[in-house]
Amino acid sequence: MLAGILDFRSARMSLDSLLLSRLAPWRSSSAWWVAFSGGLDSTVLLHALTRLSERQALPVIRAIHVHHGLQAAGDDWPAHCQRVCDQLGVTLEIVRVRVVPGASLERAARDARYQAFSACVGEGELLLTGQHRDDQAETLLFRLLRGAGVRGLAAMPDVRSMGRGSLVRPLLEVSRAELEDYARANGLAWVEDPSNQQLEYSRNFLRRQVLPLLQQRWPRAASSLARTAALMAEAQHLLDELAQQDLAAAQAGSDCRWLNLPSLALAPLRELTSARQRNALRHWLAGLTLAPDENHWAGWECLRDAKPDATPRWRLEGGELQRSGERVWWLPDGWLASVGGPVDWPDPSVELQLPGNGSLRLEGAPPIGRLQIRYRSGGEVMAVSGRGRRDLKRLLNEAVVPAFARKRLPLLYCNGELVAVANLPQLSAGRCALNWCAPGC
């Protein structure tokens, strides 16, 4: 945490020291991008970094300004940002985005902003944002009031991956008052977003009404809340480590890895307490969907406790979990869509692209005749070496192919006769093998 800032020299040296410490792991990066709104936080960050680069060997400093076009006052901000960058000798990238309103305009604008950042930041490059200690305290309070768990109460991480690079928040230990002191000491000008005065937004209400009241009674409230967020981040790190240990056995052993779908074995998970099961699943689902809140875990219990021949489903954002035998599988919405009809394959030496269903390659000597890819409709039979003609449904049961995958499993027909099933070499007539690269997540 920065000590009290008394004059220009001490302010500069304190902020320099903090930035050098926080950004040391990325000194070899090709570029540091500052997310430059023109507001106080990003103005101080950009100024401090450019002045620091005059005395230290740093990556090239660039700035990016995202213009949402949501309010008339904001139309002047790109020009302001350009003037500041011209004065500092910094290249500025101005990106104009269209915000699609949804349930939350704030969230839609933030999503559009970070999509623009991700597109701009190159491989191994850094995006630096100016959120400070008061922002962290505000975020913790906001999430606490929404009933967040440990991950949510960890508030904003100081580092996370973003696109091809990383996002770093180097000012989370600095208060807004300290940033204002620095800005005034250096004669900096910044813009004020008029929407920050509108108390109908929950964050503004916390910032303007709640936090000042708390700080009247407890002057170090923001510092204490930010410290709690840091402790929650540490606790979440431990929970993540525990989840990785608990998932290690559950993620092994699938007979159908060629499906390119995440799956878990149920037996290792059943050995865990309910709390550890939920922790492991939160960690596993984090990269796939929005984690369910504490009131929506009944879907998991249905999957876990169903009979082996049942096919329960747990619907989540962007897909669903399905059970097949003693495993649960994540199926994104694309997997749940229906596949098309038959596809002719005039030249089996060329990889065949299946509409919405991956691709096929034929290895070995292809059957002679008209080749066509079809999908199950029921009642299929095929000749199996040494076993005569067998019902396809029974053959797929023997191969332990999950029920949800069977409607997508490509079937190779030659002159109207089923001769091969994708990725199941035991179900292939002749000397060919049908290799299917299934669509992934």
Regions found by a protein language model. Give the residues of each.
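Non-catalytic, surface-exposed connector residues within folded enzymatic/regulatory domains
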Residues: D75, A103, E200, N204, ...
